[in-house]
Structures are given as structure tokens and as C-alpha cells.
């Protein structure tokens, strides 16, 4: 099954300026992400960026670049510009791999593509189990609750589901129904074209989670448990130091 990987790589970052180009053991972070994507078996890999320095780093590593506008509000909106510039057919399967995930396993990139291809659904994504209460209560860890068929009911930075009885006891661990969403998405190009024509939803603005736009407009998102747990993503200088140590 063929699929395309698009890696949004926005240069500006409040907490880590020039994030795609930060050095991780001798390579720019975006090159590490590119290498993981190559291991997935994708038919084509495109880095979507708004900065010439990022483009030069990717091209020096033999990668393909699509220059995009700097004013996109989300990664999916940046993907939509690439979809139009590359004139992908509506049924092209596209996997959105975040440009700040240098330790993402190639297996889960392929997993998202396969899951989408097997279903007539707007979007496919992944999650991993949460076992400790600290993560369950962390607003930077996005939680997701599912229906019986594995489709998302809601995504939130809040602690969902709320275990009314056990949380009152102040436990350090949580039960079996807690999942942390991973920021990797699969969609068909036609769905991306529809997504960007929808107005942002109120819930999306409150939670700052772009996937809530999909649920707001009545589309389904399939969520599978990831076959491998990805390593640390890079959002802060502290994350960067942790990743450098883990990748040595």
C-alpha cells in the first residue's frame, strides 16, 4: 500500500527558536525525522517548511522540500498547501509526521497509513496507554476516549475519563482506560481539502487541539494503540537535552 509522508517543519517556536535545525548528535533534528520516515517505506517524503535554512538542511540530506507560507495556524493547514502544490489525487493516503519527533518509530508511521487504508474514515491516529497519575493530570499530555469500535469520542488536555471514586483516593496509578494521544495523523488528500474549508470550532480554540475540528463537523477519527511507544518529542530546551542523551 503506497502512502506519502509530509513533515511540517515550522521554523519559529516560542520555547525553542529555530527548532527544526537544533543539533542532535551532529545532525539537525529535521534530518533525524526525515531518516525515520524513510524507514517507513513511504512512496514519497516531503518536508513542508517556511524557512530557507530548513530547506537547505533537508536538501543537503537528499530530501524533498515544499516551501509553504509562514502564517498557517496548524500543521494540517500547512499540509493542505502541499497537497494543492503537488496536485495529489483525493484518494492519496498522507501521513502527517511532526517535525519535532526525531525518535518516532518507523513502524507506527506505517501503522497509521495501514489503519487509514483499511477504513472509510476521515482520519486515523494513534495513542498509548497511560499508567501513572502524573501523566493523566498533565495538560501537555493530550488524552483521548474511544467508543467500542476504536473511534474517538473526544480529545482533551483535561483528565478524561474522570475516575470519580479512585481519584478521590489520591492514587499514583490509573486504570486501564486512559490513553495519551500521539501527534501523528493519516488522512486522504481529499479529506485535507475539506478540513481546511471548515471554520475552526469553539472546542478547538478552547483546547488548542486541531483534531477537535474533525469531531465538531461530525467526521470520525479512528484511534489504534501504537505498536511501539515513541521516544521523547522536542518542545522545550529540557526535552532537547533529554533526546540528545537518549539518542547517543
Swiss-Prot record:
| Molecular functions per Gene Ontology | 3-deoxy-manno-octulosonate cytidylyltransferase activity; magnesium ion binding
What cofactor does this chain's UniProt record say it requires? Answer: Mg(2+)
Does the record carry Transferase as a key word? Answer: yes
Q: Which Pfam families does the record associate with it?
A: CTP_transf_3
- Name the pathway it acts in: Nucleotide-sugar biosynthesis; CMP-3-deoxy-D-manno-octulosonate biosynthesis; CMP-3-deoxy-D-manno-octulosonate from 3-deoxy-D-manno-octulosonate and CTP: step 1/1; Bacterial outer membrane biogenesis; lipopolysaccharide biosynthesis
The entry's localization annotation reads:
Cytoplasm
Keyword Nucleotidyltransferase attached: yes
What does it catalyze? 3-deoxy-alpha-D-manno-oct-2-ulosonate + CTP = CMP-3-deoxy-beta-D-manno-octulosonate + diphosphate
Keyword terms: Cytoplasm, Lipopolysaccharide biosynthesis, Magnesium, Nucleotidyltransferase, Transferase
Q: Name the Gene Ontology biological process terms.
A: CMP-keto-3-deoxy-D-manno-octulosonic acid biosynthetic process; keto-3-deoxy-D-manno-octulosonic acid biosynthetic process
* Enzyme Commission number: 2.7.7.38
NCBIfam families in the record: kdsB (TIGR00466), PRK05450.1-3 (NF003950), PRK05450.1-5 (NF003952), PRK13368.1 (NF009905)
Q: Which PANTHER family match?
A: 3-DEOXY-MANNO-OCTULOSONATE CYTIDYLYLTRANSFERASE, 3-DEOXY-MANNO-OCTULOSONATE CYTIDYLYLTRANSFERASE, MITOCHONDRIAL
| Role played | Activates KDO (a required 8-carbon sugar) for incorporation into bacterial lipopolysaccharide in Gram-negative bacteria.
Q: What is the name of this protein?
A: 3-deoxy-manno-octulosonate cytidylyltransferase
Name the species this protein comes from: Escherichia coli (strain K12)
Amino acid at each position: 500500500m503506497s502512502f506519502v509522508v509530509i513533515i511540517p517543519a515550522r521554523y519559529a517556536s516560542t520555547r525553542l527558536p529555530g527548532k527544526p535545525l537544533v543539533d542532535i548528535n551532529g545532525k539537525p533534528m529535521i534530518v533525524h525525522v526525515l531518516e525515520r520516515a524513510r524507514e517507513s517505506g513511504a512512496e514519497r517524503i516531503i518536508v513542508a517548511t517556511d524557512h530557507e535554512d530548513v530547506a537547505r538542511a533537508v536538501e543537503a540530506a537528499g530530501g524533498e522540500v515544499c516551501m509553504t507560507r509562514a502564517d498557517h495556524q496548524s500543521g494540517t493547514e500547512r499540509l493542505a498547501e502541499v497537497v494543492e502544490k503537488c496536485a495529489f489525487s483525493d484518494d492519496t493516503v498522507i501521513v502527517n509526521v511532526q517535525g519535532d519527533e526525531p525518535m518516532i518509530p518507523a513502524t507506527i508511521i506505517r501503522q497509521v497509513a495501514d489503519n487509514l487504508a483499511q477504513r472509510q474514515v476521515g482520519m486515523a491516529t494513534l495513542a498509548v496507554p497511560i499508567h501513572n497519575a502524573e501523566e493523566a493530570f498533565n495538560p501537555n499530555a493530550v488524552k483521548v476516549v474511544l467508543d467500542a469500535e476504536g473511534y474517538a469520542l473526544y480529545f482533551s488536555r483535561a483528565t478524561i475519563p474522570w475516575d470519580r471514586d479512585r481519584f478521590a483516593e489520591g492514587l499514583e496509578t490509573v486504570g486501564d482506560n486512559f490513553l495519551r494521544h500521539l501527534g501523528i495523523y493519516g488522512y486522504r488528500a481529499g479529506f485535507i481539502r475539506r478540513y481546511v474549508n471548515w471554520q475552526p470550532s469553539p472546542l478547538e480554540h478552547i483546547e488548542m487541539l486541531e483534531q477537535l475540528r474533525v469531531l465538531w463537523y461530525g467526521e470520525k477519527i479512528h484511534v489504534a494503540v501504537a505498536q511501539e511507544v515513541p521516544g521523547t518529542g522536542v518542545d522545550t530546551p529540557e526535552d532537547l537535552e533529554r533526546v540528545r542523551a537518549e539518542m547517543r
